[in-house]
């Protein structure tokens, strides 16, 4: 049940933040966060996060676009890393999408 998977301490009302977080950390190197990779055994991590985000976009209130300029910097993730208690490397350059 995907709804039972803890999304690094964020509620499912913030799928955009979660998706951006994984876009930053996951493709570069293994992601060490506060939950076991076994939680994603039935589904690839990236696909699962994107699927949850697309489901949320269909809701009555669309998710807030946190970065309207389309750029993402390491400093945007300080709070997320602190909430999980994990140190997750992130590329310094902005990510375009």
From Swiss-Prot:
Any GO BP: DNA replication
Annotated region (Disordered), positions in chain: 42-68
Keywords on record: DNA replication, DNA-binding
GO molecular function annotation: DNA binding
Keyword DNA-binding: yes
Recorded superkingdom: Viruses
Ranges in coiled-coil conformation: none
Function: Accessory subunit of the DNA polymerase that acts to increase the processivity of polymerization.
Sequence similarity: Belongs to the herpesviridae polymerase accessory protein family.
Record-given protein name: DNA polymerase processivity factor
